[in-house]
Amino acid sequence: LGYLDEEKKQFRNTASKVRAIFLLQYLVCGKEKSWRETELTFNRLLTALPGHIPLPRHLSLSDEERQTADNMVAGVKANWPQMNGTSVEGFRSSFLTRKGRLEQKEEHWLLTVEEKAYDILLETIPWGFRQIRLPWIKKYVQVKWHEQQIF
C-alpha cells in the first residue's frame, strides 16, 4: 500500500501513519465509522504516531486498502484450521475485537487482553502472537492473552 519506506523500516510520513491507524481499525472491526481517540490508542502505538499529533474522527479508506485488509483477515482465518466453519465476521468479533489494557513497562509495553471462554482455541494457533516487534517502535509489545494453565 506504500505506507513504508523502501527498506520497510519506517513509515514514509505522518499521513501514512494516520492511514495505517484507520486501516488497522478496519482490519479488526470490518467497518469504517467515526472513532474516538481512545479507541485508536493501540493502533497509534503500533504506528509510532506521537500523541501530540491529532487524529481525525473518521478517515475514508480506498477500495485497495479495504480489499487488502479483508484478504488479510480471510487469510489468517483460512490458515487456522479450527476456524473452519466460522465466518469472517464471527472471527473478527471473537478474536480481533477485544477489550484490553495497555501498560508501559521499563523495557516493553504490556497488552493484557480480556479473556473469553473460547480462548482455549488460541492453544491451537499455528503462529506466535505473544510478542510484537516492529522496526519503527522502540519498545516491543508483550501480549498477555490466555495464559495456558498447567496442572
Provide a role label for each language-model segment.
Residues 1-151:
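Short, compositionally biased pre-sequence/patch detector
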